[in-house]
Amino acid sequence: MTYDKQALTDLMAKIEAGDDAGFRKANRTVFSTPCQDMALQLREEHSRHAYKGSLDAAKALHAAVLGGWGWRFDEHYGDGMPAKFERKTAWVSMPDNWRVGHTSLVKDNNPARAWLIATIKALIAECDV
């Protein structure tokens, strides 16, 4: 499936800004269709739950839209900073290029949201291919 690059960019901006109302509207724009395709509805739901912090939903969305792509998390504590500053880093990488070139690297205190942003960035990158 191909996605509209501008709609994805708008969605990513709403996620990064933490704009709940804007996110819901942009999420429907990206993952809804007039015929209400069930697969797209599930993607919209997974995206919404990942935005709210569900790692299961982030993983399900990743599998649905980036089948065959790699992913992983790293923990960063930031140069001796206290643990409360810990950030999870979500990596999303192209198939067959796991160590060579990751497409998206996102740091966020909310690992599900980091994974969601990394997934959206990867979809945006696919629009340019």
Q: Which stretches of residues belong to each language-model region?
A:
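Glycine-rich anion-binding surface patch
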Residues: M1-R113, I117, K121-V129
